[in-house]
């Protein structure tokens, strides 16, 4: 399930800052904000029937011209943070190693991910989530 940016990032930061080893298992769906929170874990497991979805989030802006302009700048920043998180996770993905070599440059990965997200919501299977680097492995049992 998705969620609000600020709430999700509070959870993301708490996981990243934890001194404990954190494993997250995605069940059913990891979409929007939950796909970002998922990236905070030290170990990211996804069940076989879970789907993964990422996209540029939606926003509403209203009010005075300058306020809307400032909000747009903040939204751009949010998108950059999101892309940095995904890039950091995916740079080690098998897909990007096959496409760009064993040590793909993060800028190439980020460019690819940006292009995919600009085409709309990006839905992928559990297998593809592992292939791209959004998840570490499929959890068949534990």
Language model features by range: what are they?
Residues 2-11, 15-61:
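Glycine-rich beta-to-alpha active-site loop
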Residues 61-142:
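Charged, glycine-interspersed solvent-exposed loop segments at helix/strand-loop junctions
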């Amino acid at each position: 399930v998705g969620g609000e940016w600020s709430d999700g990032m509070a959870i993301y930061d708490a996981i990243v800052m934890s001194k404990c080893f954190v494993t997250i298992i995605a069940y059913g769906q990891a979409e929007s904000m939950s796909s970002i929170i998922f990236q905070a874990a030290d170990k990211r497991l996804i069940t076989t029937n879970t789907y993964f979805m990422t996209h540029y989030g939606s926003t509403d802006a209203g009010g005075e011209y300058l306020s809307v302009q400032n909000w747009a700048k903040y939204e751009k920043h949010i998108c950059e943070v999101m892309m940095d998180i995904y890039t950091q996770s995916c740079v080690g993905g098998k897909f990007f190693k096959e496409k760009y070599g064993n040590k793909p440059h993060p800028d190439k990965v980020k460019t690819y991910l940006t292009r995919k997200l600009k085409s709309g919501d990006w839905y992928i299977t559990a297998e593809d989530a592992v292939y791209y680097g959004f998840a570490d492995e499929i959890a068949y049992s534990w």
